[in-house]
């Protein structure tokens, strides 16, 4: 996505953040917590990214180019708030804005959750591919799975290692946009019933399957775009 943030000022970014603090979180500056401020500020930064996202989508519709669709089981996209601040070139404005909200960028970034969409080299490589495609201005989408619990966490209890789910969605994730209108059915399990005739072999039929709903979520990222699917039984 192209950078459309040349006109961003501390005043406009502060106004956006206070708007989301009130209408997205239902809080005032006095009643808000640091988590509220992080979420509201993330929405404000996401607004800037969405401006570029919509501009990119419009160019796709007008030009109708051939597109690259990249499928990966993992994406290690990192912490989105920090990534977008630097990618959009609004670090200075962000620091001043958060000072106006009685906090700091360093404090807010402590609440920035890393998406549990992948881990290790495979996920990092997939994200790097998307960044490279976007930097070359090639129309590309990344498709993956929206893991509800992400990568497990390891803790020690009485000298024993315990694995627990990574509840990365417990407080919500401000960077994703659900697209229920594009939900599609996915069939899994079951078995194939073979069918034969005297003249030719007929295709088998699939029975005993279970249907899940694949619900897409879009995550606009500066200079790239990711679509992950959540399955619902």
Residues covered by each model-derived region:
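Residues forming anionic-ligand binding surfaces in small-molecule and nucleic-acid pockets
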Residues: 95-114
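N-terminal catalytic cores of NTP/NDP-binding nucleotidyl/phosphoryl-transfer enzymes
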Residues: 80, 116-120
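Conserved small/polar residues in nucleotide/adenosyl-binding loops
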Residues: 224-231
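A conserved hydrophobic secondary-structure block that centers on an alpha-helix together
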Residues: 123, 128-131
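Extended, charge-enriched "interface" segments that sit outside catalytic cores
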Residues: 2-63, 67-71, 76, 81-85
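Beta-sheet entry/capping signal
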Residues: 67-69, 131-132, 137-142
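Extended, regular secondary-structure scaffolds
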Residues: 119, 136-220
